Amino acid sequence: MTNTTAAIVFHNYPQSPVAEKVRVAFGIKTLSWQDVEIPRLPPKPMLTALTGGYRRTPVMQIGADIYCDSQCIIHELERRYPTPSYMPTSDAGLMWCLSRYTDGEMFTLTVKLILGSAGDTLPEDFAQDRGRLYLGEDWADGLKRANEQLPHLVSQLRAPLSWINAQLSDGRAFLLGSAPAAIDAQIYYAVWFIRGRWSGGPSMLSEFPDLMRWEENVRALGHGTSKPMSADAAIALAKSSIPTSAIGVAENEPQGLETGMLVSISPDLDGGEQPVSGNVRYADANTISIERSSDEVGQICVHFPRAGYRVTVA
């Protein structure tokens, strides 16, 4: 049985938009969490010791269970803390489908707009790291194209922002009604990023009064209650714990995975990232969990979403 009272440890940094998504998710459920601040740029040795090489932000840790990707994190928070629900209506499946757009195309447009508008003012190391992560191997050309296509990128973002504004035009407090939902956090983080990191953001967002009203409602949810924690303490917590998550492989597994099988996992795009290897502990349509061990962190279990990640049998 999962221990829902175990401490939530959140590895993040303040400027991360994807971490902001999860911080808002903490606020929706008024959760308490331990805040481990990680570097904005690699190397991130204390983080990758826990994840087996995954370097993206954020990562959630509960004992020796390590959750990578905000999709996986929000699923697990809902499972452990079902009230209040991230899915207050009967549209949970539809909202998860919509989140694939907000986390995919919509966020990619936002990144291109922000990186492209910054142009040569970006620090070289930051431009190279984020460019490679989001724009592929030819990231320098990608940044140049983004800069040249700024009006087009703005037009592509204004469309979904106008849809969101229309959804809120009946005066509802949140996207699905009177109660906040995961999809509020999954859209808000892009708006937060646009407002905070693009000089034209406040002006563009001002075109959408209902969206701005909603933005204030989401901001007022807060981030739950956090206390700082050192990376060393997080490592020690993992080493003194054992994984408590489920074991097994669901029926109709399309890749023929079995418990104990050695696999590697990586984002299903070319971001130049190191795959994470381990032995299958659990797999179903939504999640894959692998076991790893090292002298530094002991026995751990690293969890990833199935959607958006490639699993390769070793």
Each language-model region and where it sits:
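GST-like fold's C-terminal all-alpha helical module
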Residues: 102-220
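GST-like domain detector, emphasizing the conserved glutathione-binding G-site
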Residues: 1-134, 141, 257, 264, ...
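Short, charged beta-turn/beta-strand-edge "cap" motif at the junction between a beta-strand
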Residues: 268-272
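Mixed-charge, Lys/Arg-rich low-complexity intrinsically disordered regions
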Residues: 224-259
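Short gly/pro-enriched beta-turn/loop segments at secondary-structure junctions
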Residues: 180-182, 257-260
